From Swiss-Prot:
It comes from Streptococcus agalactiae serotype V (strain ATCC BAA-611 / 2603 V/R). This is Uracil-DNA glycosylase. CDD domains: UDG-F1-like. InterPro entries: UDG_fam1, Ura-DNA_Glyclase_AS, Uracil-DNA_glycosylase-like, Uracil-DNA_glycosylase-like_sf. The gene is ung. NCBIfam families: PRK05254.1-1, PRK05254.1-2, PRK05254.1-4, PRK05254.1-5, ung. It holds the Pfam family UDG. PROSITE patterns: U_DNA_GLYCOSYLASE. The lineage of its organism: Bacteria, Bacillati, Bacillota, Bacilli, Lactobacillales. The active site is at residue 62.
Amino acid sequence: MKHSSWHDLIKRELPNHYYNKINTFMDAVYESGIVYPPRDKVFNAIQITPLENVKVVIIGQDPYHGPQQAQGLSFSVPDNLPAPPSLQNILKELAEDIGSRSHHDLTSWAQQGVLLLNACLTVPEHQANGHAGLIWEPFTDAVIKVVNQKETPVVFILWGGYARKKKSLIDNPIHHIIESPHPSPLSAYRGFFGSRPFSRTNHFLEEEGINEIDWLN
């Protein structure tokens, strides 16, 4: 992270010494119990997707809390694991919108410029939202603010009430926001299904002269 395109710009948005606080927090939680994702994958979203490459942002809440699921990318799991319910619904909507994708691992999206950002970057095993409100939100809000400052258009995809609260951080008029209910089984039928976020994103990118995302790759 230290040498990434993000580092200094994020640092400007944070209180003094906040990176030190994050490192101290991670030292403590990884030494005291099982935490996901593996420590070397915590910052995967911004390590795989450099700031200059960001075309799309998909905001999640926190990592999956089961063994081997979390990869540091929102909604993504390794291909050898079953898709969790929200990801199943994302892939179902993708199939209806554009076409079928067999991969559960969304790294290829990240490599194309889709920033798969969770608001909270770590979670204790089997404790959803177990690290919420402790350290990460100022950092990930800073990431969103840095993307908001970009001079090239970005699509922000906000699924569910939690992600939609981040809308207040996105005030640059060149960007485009797509909102819908969350893809979880509890809310997918309330407007996520049929929202066509993938084709709508590509339509916006095409109109702006930006290469589209190959969502099926």
